[in-house]
Amino acid sequence: METNQHNATVPNHLVQWLDEHPPVLTDEPREAVTDKTAKSELDFYRLSMRRFDPREHGLPWSMQAQCPKCSEIVPAEFQMIKDQVVLVFDCPKDGRIKQAHYDNIFRPDPQNLKTYGGKAIEPILPMLPRTVETLCPECSAVILGRYYVRDGSVWVEKTCPDHGYFRDCINRDVEHYSKMAWISYGEHCGVMKPHVKDAKRCPSDCGLCDQHQSPSILANIDLTNRCNLNCPVCFANANVAGYVYEPTFEQLVEMLQRLRDYRPIPCTCVQFSGGEPTIHPDFFKIVSKARDMGFSQIQIATNGIKMADEEFARQAYEAGLHTLYLQFDGVNDDVYMKTRGKPLMKYKIATIENCRKFGMKVCLVPTIIRGENDDQVAKILEFAVDNIDTVSGISYQPVSFTGRIDMHELDAKRYTVGDLAHDLAKASGADPIRDFFPLNYTVPFSEIISVICGMPKIQTPCHPDCANGTYFWVSPDKKLYPFPMVFDLEPMFGELHRLAKKLETQGRKATFFDKLKIGWLFYKHFRPDRAPKDLTFYRLVRSLQGMVNKKVGRGSNAKTYKTLLAAGMHFQDRYNFDVQRIKRCVIHYSTPEGIFPFCTYNCGPSYRPFIEKMYAKKLNPKAENIPADVQNSKPAQVMETTTNG
């Protein structure tokens, strides 16, 4: 390992590659805003987030909390008692109750691991109850809260000094939560040249700052906030914002280059979003430029209206588009009238058919609201299986709440990744505990590919609360076989991780004999008696190669096998916000003002409106390219929510 001045390390097998591929842009990092340097509206907003800073404030910290005996909301106070963080409840009914909490906010972990920017990396605490740095849903100030277990569910509660008490459900299955929380393959050290140095606190200094700990596995770039729909669940709509945000081609190229300049792991996957990205006047030119700049995966977050046109889809494919992240809330128009206010199913079907014609992949993206369309989870899975030749995955997105909502309604409509695991298990025959895993579970797979190739490969060291799901093998008779049923994944990934670290330490690429050992590990942990009868080990290996190598292809011939990803990506909002999650975010936004984690840009502190206004244009009040049957529909009446697409 080569150690930099801040104790973060670059694996030796990547040193040569990094020397041969210096960044193109030479951006100088900006300083974190202070009382003396604050000038803009955004600057003062950043400062306001720090005004109750728990680390600066210290203990004791007064709040309200749910009594562990009677469940009433009572006065409480976090105190330091004999080097232990303790929440002291003052319950009128049950008296004074003390409850110790796991903590690394006031009791820093002694590990000496730092980011490339020199900031200490605090380990994830899987134990409960624990302290958490979170946000006030009303004002976005960073405040102290706690994760705790009640009636088999995991909850977060907090009290803002200005706006009072809030509580939200994190996961309705504590066993599912605990399994995810304990899975870890070590920490990543972030990016080598962060755009903000000497950050004071997360998330007040986003852009990315030197506290950030993860690379980007997928970067979003908003081409426009204009749209040919007016969905009530969208956070990026010019008709609501009152202005147009639409970067120029030159600005977009610079934003793309900033992603390619990520080190030590360049960003290779970009998603153009909006608004509706397909209505940008330079859409095809932008997609083509991304291909020429070396992005190996180019996708769009789209409602499918433009892509339903065959000629438009053909031009998009020829420009270099690989995948559609297709807004897909259900399998009939009754659902779309609820969530989008428009009958859209025919556009979804036409879009998928065009992707089938031109060989593009589709990932279905449903926004799931408990009690509204969670009955569609199984139906969407069935639809994906019926279209497995084109649909490669489903990214279920539990809704994020950006508007005000009382706790009763929040609980009624909050859909968690634990809910999703159980709904998918019922629909597929999978086990909600054994067969589902967090996104960071795949880190060893990326590590071993990197040492084989001798070059950086994207990794997913995100927080286990951010996303979880499973891959399925899909047999010709459309039966689903979860990967963990066919593979003993836990011991196999553990061995792959140890082998990758050994090769990194030795500073060399994998030899022929190393590759044989890797193949043996896959063979050793393969369970053919649990697999589809026609899934041979050779087809299995070729299928895994096809998931990371376009030359092999995904289920494209008799040598490979169809696979389907079914996962939940639970973006945060101010009610369930956890600063530890943000520091490990792997879904980023590239903007003219720098790069932001998804949940700080959209649905936590929400930097989006500040950035967009800085580059806004005069609003053309009428959305463009709206088909007549859609344009005349009335918008749905739902609460203010957010979704990606």
Q: Where does each model-flagged region fall?
A:
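Conserved alpha-helical substructure of the radical SAM core
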Residues: 90-98, 102, 148, 152-177, ...
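Short, flexible, mixed-charge glycine/proline-rich loop motifs
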Residues: 54-62, 79-84, 123-131, 148-153, ...
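Short cysteine-rich clusters marking metal-coordination/redox-active sites
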Residues: 67-70, 91, 136-139, 160, ...
